[in-house]
Amino acid sequence: MTGQLTTPAVLDRMARDFADHDALVTADRSFTFAELRDEVRRTAAAIAGLGIDPGDRVAIWSPNTWHWVVACLSIHYAGAILVPLNTRYTATEAADILLRTEAPLLIGMGRFLGADRVADLDRDALPALRHIVRIPLDGDDGTWDEFMAGVGVPLSEVDARGAAVRPDDVSDILFTSGTTGRSKGVLCSHRQSLSAPAAWAACGQVTAADRYLCINPFFHNFGYKAGILACLQTGATLIPQLTFDPEQAM
């Protein structure tokens, strides 16, 4: 693998070299690598249009959907830092991380597994949180389409932001489980976040000929890095599953 070890650079390269190859397949929507890059750039423009600057933290609190993949890559393309949140967090637990990271944008889930945790957030206790975008899951309660229809920045600005990202820039902050105390945010650079899954994929002999069913949650290192970022670098087709369902998986 050659070129800059940043998520935007890898996506650009894969969109060029594997343009018509399936990158992401779900029951709702599918993308080739070229289509995925186009969607990521449009979403990054919408993110930047909300006033999100390079270096800002953007949280994703949602299960495995195509929106998660697009949002993740778009956050990086906009020069921002991804903060994944566990879908089983209570609103109080999620709020603690949102407060500590001072995230101005949360891309969250609509009603999921009978609960609406995003609606339970105490916005008054989160002064930095200016925007919430809801991904529709169990009902028609999402705001993703409205978010995408909003006024974004020009794609030329998005491309400039993506090109400005460097390998040693922070790409994500993943919080520990807090088994022995308060959870701690672990900062990883683009170089780190891409190198580890590339090595893992090489050991597992993952190639563009593979179709990768990802049941592991994207909010965890396994689903995010050994899933999304491994597929991104190898050309394997990512097939995410919302929650584990043996019959559906088979």
Kindly give the residue locations of the regions a language model identified:
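Conserved S/T- and glycine-rich ATP-binding loop of Class I adenylate-forming
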Residues: 58, 75, 106, 170, ...
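Short hydrophobic alpha-helices that are characteristic scaffold elements of the AMP-binding
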Residues: 73-78, 99-100, 220, 229-233
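Conserved AMP-binding/adenylation subdomain of ANL enzymes
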Residues: 194-211, 219-250
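Conserved pre-ATP/AMP-binding loop-to-beta segment of ANL
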Residues: 4, 19, 134, 152-175, ...
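Conserved AMP-binding/adenylate-forming core of the ANL superfamily
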Residues: 2-7, 12, 20-73, 90-95, ...
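Conserved AMP-binding A3 loop
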Residues: 32-35, 171-195
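Structural core segment of the AMP-binding/adenylate-forming
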Residues: 49-50, 77-146
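Conserved AMP-binding
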Residues: 62-65, 86-88, 206, 216-220
